[in-house]
Amino acid sequence: MINSNDRQSTLVVAMSGGVDSSVVAGILCEQGYNVIGITLQLYDHGMATAKKNACCAGQDIYDAKMVANKLGMPHYVLDYESKFKESVIDNFVDSYLRGETPLPCVQCNKSVKFRDLIKTAKELGADKLVTGHYVRKINGDNGPELHMGLDPLKDQSYFLFATTKEQLEYLDFPLGALTKDETRKLASKFGLEVADKPDSQDICFVPDGNYKNVINKIRPNASESGKILHINGFELGTHSGIINYTIGQRRGLGISYHEPLYVIKIDPNSNIVYVGPESALNVQEFVIKDVNWLAGSLKDGEKLEVSVKVRSTRPPRLAEISKLEGDRMKVKFLSEEKAVAPGQACVIYDGTRVLGGGWITRDVIPA
């Protein structure tokens, strides 16, 4: 499973305390590698540290340590709270204040889990950093390629689009060809107590799923009231802060109208939430920024037919991308898509291969 024939290689496993990374550690120990487990303490929000479906907090650190003891491997806990707050939590909060829908898991993988943890692994003399993500690393003609996991229900490639070529060289993902059931069976085989542990939540640092409390704690003036306008220009009511809204939202708008209304646009500068009929959510094209490209090079103006995902839970859609100046791309759907939200990621695929991706901007053109 690991691209190394040297059983004397030292491999660092990023251990969250969950079943996936624990099984990775078990696989590598069984194969005879020198394995070091590292768990990152990322936050401490009271209730969240004791939740069974959180990650990288109190109970999970204990679980990771117990797994390491069971497997007879060294294990270290690193305090990354300040790095995590700076790179992930602050970005999450500020994204909502910009009227965006943030994606903290990508930011965490991009910065803390890969950039910072790879640096630590190299300082320990490790040959690879190995994680429990459900993606595949396949050696292509021009180097390693990032591919979807074989299990479509667990594929995590959308969340790893920002992985750089250099990071991909150093990473390995042994679970990419497995299903979750197969992973749990391996956990039972290794005698790991986490075999039946529930999966972690998407936003690990938000207690009880109430992200607004996190935002208001860090930015006390975040919930500033403002107008709710119909896209045709007339006022329908007031809101208690743009952080309470996301593109495509229908429920909880706090207004009444003779037809269902959806959030179409959020303007942070004027503090206005625009609503309209479902048809107004249709998008034909948009621009992405901070593009990470893993497949060769593209010239400005060059076009390519691909498939793209604009939400992790949506299937890929056929689209045409064209390279813009700098690190931006234009994405044009071959058939319109709904509710393309600024702040989310657009991940670009060729079949199962991740070609790259970027962050959706406000440059969204309705259908």
Swiss-Prot record:
One of its GO terms (cellular component) is cytoplasm. Coiled coil: none annotated. It catalyses: S-sulfanyl-L-cysteinyl-[protein] + uridine(34) in tRNA + AH2 + ATP = 2-thiouridine(34) in tRNA + L-cysteinyl-[protein] + A + AMP + diphosphate + H(+). One of its GO terms (biological process) is tRNA wobble position uridine thiolation. The active site is at C108 (nucleophile), C204 (cysteine persulfide intermediate). Keywords: ATP-binding, Cytoplasm, Disulfide bond, Nucleotide-binding, RNA-binding, Transferase, tRNA processing, tRNA-binding. Residues 154-156 are annotated as: Interaction with tRNA. ATP binds at A14, M15, S16, G17, G18, V19, D20, S21, L40, G132. Disulfide bonds join C108-C204. One of its GO terms (molecular function) is tRNA-uridine 2-sulfurtransferase activity. It comes from the Bacteria. The record marks H133, Q344 as: Interaction with tRNA. Its EC number is 2.8.1.13. It is found in: Cytoplasm. Belongs to the MnmA/TRMU family. Catalyzes the 2-thiolation of uridine at the wobble position (U34) of tRNA, leading to the formation of s(2)U34. This is tRNA-specific 2-thiouridylase MnmA. It comes from Rickettsia bellii (strain OSU 85-389).
